[in-house]
């Protein structure tokens, strides 16, 4: 079953959906499909009152949380979908994965002397991992780079990742200092995400001079790979969306030719081998 906060969010979504459907139905000539959708919403709200919302109508186990967040009218768990429903879900996941990959930057990215490379491999069809590289509008000057991870899994996480991508693409054009950009992004993200949803994120600006300014919202340390070893750059603020107010101080470093900055998500550091041993931060820094 979902938490009370999630149920409150889902109830709000259902009520808003009902009002929109009723308004559309009033302006139509008795559309049967709209009337059926209104009935489905009423059934879902009734199940909330009875305490059975979120339970599979076949086996009475919980419907997957990410599927309810994506569609509050879901009433069957994955194990009890009909063949047409399963095919429709597979088609939706395939489309979501295609959209998500289309948002990734070029694999080989070069800008003002900087070379960026990344590897993206979701654990399932879609994920909440986020990666972007944004050139300035005039094509010269600093490069904005971001790596993050949103809370949750599956389709719900991928939808949140898409929201994060669109938000930073829009805010990047404002020209704010990095710490102010992060604070504004936090307020926007907090206002649009549901309670309990958040994102960890490293955001940075790289200049042609080799200077790099970094701000981290609760994300795993960035690894500065230098000639003399590896330096960890820790988070400077809380995850985005956790609280609507917060500060995100930045730190500026200077990379010399041949040095690099390694950013990653927990899919790397928490990977386990056949003996169920976690890879861990220490081994990652020793690569």
Language model: regions and residue ranges:
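Interaction interfaces in information-processing and related assembly proteins
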Residues: 1-50
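Short metal-coordination and nucleic-acid-contact micro-motifs, chiefly zinc-binding Cys/His arrays
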Residues: 49-53, 73
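Short, cysteine/histidine-rich loop/knuckle motifs that typically chelate Zn2+
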Residues: 57-59, 79
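Cys/His-rich microdomains that often coordinate metals
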Residues: 63, 84
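Short Cys/His-rich "knuckle" micro-motifs
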Residues: 66-72, 87-89
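Cysteine-rich micro-motifs
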Residues: 70-82
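… and, occasionally, acidic/histidine-rich disordered N-termini of signaling adaptors
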Residues: 85-262
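C-terminal catalytic subdomain
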Residues: 183, 202, 254-263, 268-287
């Amino acid at each position: 079953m979902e938490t009370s906060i999630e149920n409150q969010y889902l109830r709000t979504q259902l009520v808003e959906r009902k009002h929109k459907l009723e308004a559309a139905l009033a302006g139509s000539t008795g559309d049967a499909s709209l009337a059926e959708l209104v009935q489905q919403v009423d059934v879902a709200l009734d199940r909330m009152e009875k305490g059975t919302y979120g339970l599979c109508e076949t086996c009475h186990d919980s419907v997957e949380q990410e599927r309810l967040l994506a569609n509050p009218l879901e009433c069957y768990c994955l194990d009890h979908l009909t063949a047409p429903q399963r095919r429709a879900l597979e088609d939706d996941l395939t489309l979501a994965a295609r959209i998500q990959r289309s948002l990734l930057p070029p694999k080989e990215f070069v800008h003002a002397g900087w070379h960026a490379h990344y590897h993206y491999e979701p654990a399932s069809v879609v994920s909440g991992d986020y990666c972007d590289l944004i050139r300035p509008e005039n094509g010269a000057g600093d490069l904005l780079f971001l790596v993050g991870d949103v809370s949750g899994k599956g389709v719900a996480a991928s939808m949140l990742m898409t929201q994060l991508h669109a938000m930073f693409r829009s805010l990047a054009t404002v020209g704010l200092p990095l710490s102010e950009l992060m604070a504004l992004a936090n307020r926007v993200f907090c206002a649009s995400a549901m309670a309990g949803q958040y994102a960890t994120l490293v955001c940075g600006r790289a200049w042609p001079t080799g200077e790099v300014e970094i701000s981290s919202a609760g994300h795993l340390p960035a690894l500065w790979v230098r000639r003399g070893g590896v330096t960890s750059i820790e988070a400077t603020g809380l995850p985005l969306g956790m609280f609507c107010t917060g500060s995100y101080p930045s730190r500026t470093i200077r990379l010399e030719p041949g040095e690099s900055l390694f950013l990653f998500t927990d899919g790397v550091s928490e990977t386990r081998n056949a003996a169920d041993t976690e890879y861990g931060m220490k081994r990652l820094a020793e690569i």
